[in-house]
Amino acid sequence: MKRAIIIGATSGIGEEVAKLLVQQGWHIGIAGRREEALEKLQATAPGQIVIQRLDVTDPDAPTLLETFIRKLGGMDLFFLSSGIGSQNPDLKPEIELNTTRTNVEGFTRMVTSAFNYFKTRGEGHIAAISSIAGTKGLGIAPAYSATKRFQNTYIEALAQLSRMQHLNIHFTDIRPGFVATDLLKSGKFPMLMQANQVAKSIVCALNRKKRVIVIDSRYRVVVFFWRMIPRWLWERLPIKN
């Protein structure tokens, strides 16, 4: 029996991934801040889903995760879908700091907890949703793009650490483009993808234990050309949504 814990499963990509894993026979633990949404999803497959209210910015979240793992009966896959982001060209401090609190502090808190759990087992799979926004610094969303770059680098560092310690821990860094979720409530975004379609690509990548996946093919082209742009030119480009 395969077991997964999904953090940030109350909506969007996390919720859709949870549904697909249940269809594939996984037993899953879903966690997030909105208990009502968790209960609604649990009702669709009560024999396969357990729930836990959890906020990644809470210092006690790792302790809750440990309890949740025991409640599920173990964990083979840790999937982190919790994150926030906003355009903030005016650099409002509360937006920048809230973004880093969730996407850096909360991310680090949960991923290190999962790593340490799998370290005791000697194996496991850690997957996290970052973004193509981590490819370059985005002037319209400084904290968001910077925190996503942090996530890319942190996962890379843990992958190296896992090998150094001779652990059989797999890592999947999921980098989608624009997805129609609660994060994109305002503004007009090009090439907008639906969460259920993105989730299908993610589950396929998880089953294959892919190290990095950019979703979808259009955004793979975008990222390819972004990487070719030199810094002096990038900083002069008026990047907008």
PLM-predicted stretches and their roles:
Residues 10-11:
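Conserved glycine-rich cofactor-binding loop
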Residues 45-60:
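Rossmann-fold cofactor-recognition segment
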Residues 81-87:
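Conserved NAD(P)H cofactor-binding loop of Rossmann-fold oxidoreductase domains
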Residues 88-101:
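Short alpha-helical oligomerization interface
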Residues 111, 147:
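Active-site helix of classical SDR
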Residues 131:
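Residue(s) in the substrate-gating loop at a strand-loop-helix junction
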Residues 173, 185-223:
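C-terminal helical subdomain
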